[in-house]
């Protein structure tokens, strides 16, 4: 992401390591050597270990302060190439002291592939029983740093908190992280299942939330759709054009094909793409911000760019979604078997058929009328037709007494 300059989220959320079913993780991890957390990755291959602003210990409210110490382990990575595999930028994984591949080391022991870290108040002579992660039961946890973060040569991929994942996909990701060189051997499998992974997972999140009782009332859904425009959100059962207006090609708003417009959040592609959307802090502090005073008020523009690296396992999937949904109005996914909406079909079937002869006469008559118009009248007529097309999309939004409110998404 181009927001890589931002090294931490503020304020940092409380991290709860949780099972897919929502239960609390065990005090002792399962089999294997998988880290509880996602990795740090070098932006440029230097081989230099990361340095940290702050403690360097990832946030985890499940771990007592005295046990908030551990190490970052170097994971050498490779990619296939002519003449054999070639090294790429290193990844680093965090383990608590006494766990993981170097669980036999004492805190501070010298090792070229280890960086020791501890939080304020931690006692490195005491080791907790937090173990390592069982990839068949637990997901990787997102990295969050309350006290700063790694230096500017390191980044980490965005992972939403409380995300839903299948057990199989969790296991694949964890094994990839834990084995040297396995990133390349598993890449083919990841590419082949990329379409099933991200979109299906996003759709399952919505279904699971509904099963767990996190339903939204009709009143709440309407309230979400009627907020100030920049604070609105799509609730289940709402069409995109009902909340954010009709889609247009080549100008805002232009994201969404007909399937996404109709289904809203039920379309897993929408939830998947939210992974690329900046947080309010990132949007404000990582954007090119311009402000112009116009007759109708102050226009503030935020220009933000999110970069999906080509080596990202979901790169092909994000590219496909963008191909389908950027300027996608009037189209549907090629593999979508869904026919046109029943309401539209019903309207067409119930409408009386117009004889071809009558339709031809009507068009012919219109052409005769238009041909009798002067050039000036034709220009005026075209403008009127254009205005009719966009009457439901106001150029100016009436915010009421103030442009901002206390409601946050």
UniProtKB/Swiss-Prot annotation:
Phosphoserine sites (modified residues): 192
Domain CoV N NTD: 32-157
The keyword Transcription appears for this protein: yes
Residues annotated as domain CoV N CTD: 217-333
Composition bias, Basic and acidic residues: 176-197, 332-349
Molecular function terms from GO: RNA binding
Region (Dimerization): 228-335
Function, in words: Packages the positive strand viral genome RNA into a helical ribonucleocapsid (RNP) and plays a fundamental role during virion assembly through its interactions with the viral genome and membrane protein M. Plays an important role in enhancing the efficiency of subgenomic viral RNA transcription as well as viral replication.
Family, similarity comment: Belongs to the gammacoronavirus nucleocapsid protein family.
Compartments, record wording: Virion; Host endoplasmic reticulum-Golgi intermediate compartment; Host Golgi apparatus
Modified residues (Phosphothreonine): 374
Region RNA-binding, residue ranges: 30-161
Mod. after translation: ADP-ribosylated. The ADP-ribosylation is retained in the virion during infection. Phosphorylated on serine and threonine residues.
Pfam families documented for this protein: CoV_nucleocap
Name of the molecule in the record: Nucleoprotein
Subunit structure: Homooligomer. Both monomeric and oligomeric forms interact with RNA. Interacts with protein M. Interacts with NSP3; this interaction serves to tether the genome to the newly translated replicase-transcriptase complex at a very early stage of infection.
Keyword Transcription regulation among record annotations: yes
Disulphide-bonded residues: 322-325
Key words, A-Z: ADP-ribosylation, Disulfide bond, Host Golgi apparatus, Phosphoprotein, Ribonucleoprotein, RNA-binding, Transcription, Transcription regulation, Viral nucleoprotein, Virion
Region (Disordered): 1-64, 167-197, 327-409
